[in-house]
Structure formats: structure tokens, C-alpha cells
A protein has these predicted regions:
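Conserved glycine(s) of the Walker
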Residues: 39
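P-loop (Walker A) phosphate-binding loop of NTP-binding proteins
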Residues: 35
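Active-site signature of alpha/beta-hydrolase-fold catalytic machinery across serine-
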Residues: 46
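Conserved NTP phosphate-binding and transfer environment spanning the P-loop NTPase/kinase superfamily
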Residues: 2-12, 142-198
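Post-Walker A helix-loop "phosphate-sensing" segment adjacent to the P-loop in P-loop NTPases
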Residues: 49-59
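Extreme N-terminal, non-catalytic leader segments
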Residues: 1-30
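Hydrophobic positions on the alpha1 helix immediately C-terminal to the Walker A/P-loop
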Residues: 43
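Conserved nucleotide-sensing/catalytic segment adjacent to the nucleotide-binding pocket
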Residues: 59-62, 68-119, 135
Length: 198
């Protein structure tokens, strides 16, 4: 289905061209990182829609849906920004149930959501499969941290200064804008623009 052409959609079509020029066939993961309230989830949703416009198999997920429960996080110490930055997302769960099985292709099933952050509760997993050629658009804070960034085929960062304490810790350790292939300025969400690229 063709999307209505707006300045945002036209820009994201250019981003999609760039993404597709950087990848080959098979299973591909595009990761979008950025500070809290930067619009990364909406960007991921919109980019996925633009990629689907080209009749590509596209899946969406957010690292927010792979959190540790508050009880599990408490095992790592008091509720601080550092604890959240280090242990808020269950990276092992993300890998085991989404990233690794998605990469395996074939009939291997994966889940795009495992945890409800608002309810602080696990969700019933919905296992899905996809074709051999498919794109996963994954958004979330801290995805371009050093220990995760090599898992992604294309890394996108939303431009913006961190205002949250956990984001400030993450950016002090590794600014996602410095390692992303594509950096997007969404200060005007209806008229996003490139802020940089590698």
C-alpha cells in the first residue's frame, strides 16, 4: 500500500533507500537508538511502514518490551539510573527470543514482545516466523552500546541531547550518534532531516 506523500514520508523513503543500499539478502536488523522522548519509536514505526511500501517483509519490535521486571532489577541493587542503564533491559531475553531466532530464518519462530513495562508483567508470547528475506526494525534506548552494536546490520541514531540520568550515563560511555551509520534530527517531527552519516 502506497503511503500518502508528506515531507516526513518523502524523507523516510530516502532513509529506506540508504538502509537498503547497505544490506544484502537474508535477515536484516535495523536498530534505532536515541534518548528518552526523542521519537525513536515513532521513527521506527514510520520507517517500517515505508519499507513495507516496497513489498518487503518487515517486523517491528522495541527493546522496551524486553525489560526485566522491577523485582528482577532489584537483585542488582537500589533503584538508580545506573542500575536501569546496566540492567533495565534483559539483553539475554532479547537475544534468546528475538535476535538469535530471527537471524536463524527458516521455520525458527521468534517473539517481538515479551514483557509489559506498564503492568510490570510478562505477556503471553506470540511466536511468529517470516520469510528468508526479512527486515526487523528494532528501537530502544542503549541499543548502540558497545556490547550490543555489532548485532545490528544498520544502526540509526536519533539526534538529541540526553536529559534523563540513565541516558546521560549511556551517552558518556558511548554516544550513539558517533557510531550510527545514519543520524536523524527530528527536532521538527514533520520535517526530519539528516544530521550526519558514516
Amino acid at each position: 500500500m502506497r503511503l500518502v506523500t508528506t515531507p516526513r514520508v518523502a524523507f523516510l523513503r530516502q532513509v529506506a533507500d540508504d538502509v537498503l543500499a547497505r544490506i544484502g539478502r537474508g535477515r536484516v536488523i535495523v536498530a534505532i537508538d536515541g534518548p528518552v522522548r526523542s521519537g525513536k519509536t515513532q521513527l521506527a514505526d514510520d520507517l517500517a511502514d515505508v519499507l513495507r511500501e516496497r513489498d518487503l517483509a518487515v517486523f517491528r519490535a522495541s527493546s522496551e518490551d524486553f525489560h526485566r521486571s522491577r523485582e528482577a532489577q532489584a537483585a542488582y541493587g537500589p533503584d538508580t539510573a545506573e542500575r536501569y542503564w546496566r540492567y533495565g533491559i534483559d539483553e539475554s531475553l532479547l537475544d534468546r527470543t528475538l535476535v538469535d531466532p530471527f537471524r536463524m530464518a527458516g521455520s525458527t519462530a521468534f517473539v517481538t514482545r515479551a514483557f509489559d513495562l506498564v503492568r510490570d508483567a510478562w505477556v503471553e508470547p506470540k511466536w511468529v516466523t517470516g520469510p528468508a528475506d526479512a527486515i526487523l526494525v528494532l528501537d530502544g534506548r542503549f541499543l548502540l552500546r558497545e556490547r550490543l552494536r555489532d548485532q545490528w546490520d544498520v544502526a540509526i541514531a536519533v539526534d538529541g541531547e540526553p536529559t534523563d540520568a540513565a541516558d546521560r550515563l549511556a551517552y558518556a560511555a558511548s554516544d550513539p550518534r558517533e557510531v550510527a551509520a545514519i543520524v536523524i534530527d527530528q527536532s521538527d517531527p514533520e520535517h526530519p532531516r539528516r544530521a550526519g552519516a558514516r
